[in-house]
Amino acid sequence: MAVDYSLYLVTDRILVGPKDFLLSIRKALEGGVTLLQLREKETNSREFYDIGVKVKELAAEFGVPLIINDRVDLALALDADGVHVGQQDLPLAKVRNIIGPDKILGYSVSSLEEALQGERMGADYLGAGPVFPTGSKKDAAEAIGLAKLKEIKAGVSLPVVGIGGIGAANLRVVKETGIDGVSVISAILSQEDPCAAAKGLVDLWRN
């Protein structure tokens, strides 16, 4: 499947509140989000699944692929388009064996060494970061900066998405590293109008 990585939204139900969660995602999709990741760190498996069913319907309505964060089992149960795993999750090669060759497999990296490992082990794309300090992830590592992001992109043949602290104010300089897209949370979901926020980011990326 051809994937547009340019504006990759990672969800945060705690940030927007359960009541406004689906509406915020709909507005973000209306604004031009090209890839969606469902990330649920604070819920049990059943609740995650129930939320996932609704989010998958929304993503399908807009023709946007749905990626599940970490939970390979739920990605399969939901028949999502793919799964994104990090350094502390199941080994990448094992995840690829489980999900098969056709699902999208994303991998979080913070160095060229990790990126090369991801490429060898069967990742379809890399999420590199955090590029800048971020408040959206409590467990975020130290920021890697633009130079290292550029190094990662230059060192692999896979699509690379910049993650962490990216928003309207710095998107242009991030794009100049040559990466294929940006992953955001608060730059869309913390804004008063997620649709307008997404449109603004799309315009910055394309122009």
Swiss-Prot record:
InterPro entries: Aldolase_TIM, ThiamineP_synth_sf, ThiamineP_synth_TenI, TMP_synthase. GO terms for molecular function: magnesium ion binding; thiamine-phosphate diphosphorylase activity. It comes from the Bacteria. Pfam families: TMP-TENI (PF02581). One of its GO terms (cellular component) is cytoplasm. Its EC number is 2.5.1.3. GO terms for biological process: thiamine biosynthetic process; thiamine diphosphate biosynthetic process. It catalyses: 2-[(2R,5Z)-2-carboxy-4-methylthiazol-5(2H)-ylidene]ethyl phosphate + 4-amino-2-methyl-5-(diphosphooxymethyl)pyrimidine + 2 H(+) = thiamine phosphate + CO2 + diphosphate; 2-(2-carboxy-4-methylthiazol-5-yl)ethyl phosphate + 4-amino-2-methyl-5-(diphosphooxymethyl)pyrimidine + 2 H(+) = thiamine phosphate + CO2 + diphosphate; 4-methyl-5-(2-phosphooxyethyl)-thiazole + 4-amino-2-methyl-5-(diphosphooxymethyl)pyrimidine + H(+) = thiamine phosphate + diphosphate. NCBIfam families: thiE. HAMAP family: TMP_synthase. This is Thiamine-phosphate synthase. It comes from Desulfitobacterium hafniense (strain DSM 10664 / DCB-2).
